[in-house]
Structures are given as C-alpha cells and as structure tokens.
Amino acid sequence: AWNRRSRSCGGVLRDPPGKIFNSDGPQKDCVWTIKVKPHFHVVIAIPPLNLSCGKEYVELLDGPPGSEIIGKICGGISLVFRSSSNIATIKYLRTSGQRASPFHIYYYADPEGPLPFPYFERQTIIATEKNIP
C-alpha cells in the first residue's frame, strides 16, 4: 500500500497530496495511476529533472494508462499539469543497463472550476529533448 511517500515502482495512488519517488530497484518501467475524488482534477508538479535523456524519461498521461501522452520529460524544466478528469498517470521508463536517476514528483487534488494559477493544459506538448523516443 502506498502511504503519501513511496519508493515503490508504480501503483494506484488515491490519497492526495503525495510525493512519488522513483525506484532504484531492478524494474525498468514504473506506472503510477493517480485517482482523486469525482469533480476534482489531478495536479502534478514536476521539479526540474536530471535524467539521462534517450535512456530514461518520465511520461505524463491525461487519464488512466493507455490515455493520451501529454509529454515525455527528462530534464531542463519544471512544470505543473492539471488533468482533464480525476485520473492521471505517470510513467518512468529506462533502458536496460541504465541506472535509475533520483527524482520526485508531487501530486494534489484540485476542485473543478476556474484555475487559480497557470497550469499546462491538455493540449500542451512537453518535450525537453529531441532524442527521446
């Protein structure tokens, strides 16, 4: 079970606010699905990452696994994203032999309604490196 802070490789997270840490274990692909109460949106805050672009990156999806990929992020920027529903997914992917770089990502629940400050919207494409597959 995930309890506000986790170094586990993936899972379903239902208790915002929280903080996700990447796993330094053998897993190459980690998927966290964040579900908040109906009539709320998921807000994801990603500080600047320092991942080895091309070998590891984070994907941000607007909805459950299999939803539209909003962007692939490996470094250079910080961002805040607000989902279009009460579900968002974060994936961490790395190639075999690539040691996991440390990172953390925050998530929150935000009620429906006007945005209190600028968020990256669904149509925003986030890419910090051109060599990400």
UniProtKB/Swiss-Prot annotation:
- Please give the family membership noted in the entry: Belongs to the spermadhesin family.
Give the matching InterPro entries.
CUB_dom, Sperma_CUB_dom_sf, Spermadhesin
- Annotated protein name in UniProt: Carbohydrate-binding protein AWN
State the SMART domains in the record.
CUB (SM00042)
What keywords are assigned to this protein? Acetylation, Disulfide bond, Fertilization, Secreted
Q: What is the lineage of its organism?
A: Eukaryota, Metazoa, Chordata, Craniata, Vertebrata
For this protein, the record's Pfam families field holds: CUB
* Source species of the chain: Equus caballus (Horse)
Q: Which residues carry this modification: N-acetylalanine?
A: 1
State if Secreted is listed as a keyword.
Answer: yes
Protein's GO biological process: single fertilization
Q: What PROSITE patterns has UniProt attached to this entry?
A: CUB (PS01180), SPERMADHESIN_1 (PS00985), SPERMADHESIN_2 (PS00986)
Outline the extent of the CUB domain: 9-110
Cellular component terms per the entry's GO annotation:
extracellular region
Give a short account of what the protein does.
Mediates the binding of spermatozoa to component(s) of the egg's zona pellucida by a carbohydrate-binding mechanism. It is a secretory component of the male accessory glands being coated to the sperm surface at the time of ejaculation.
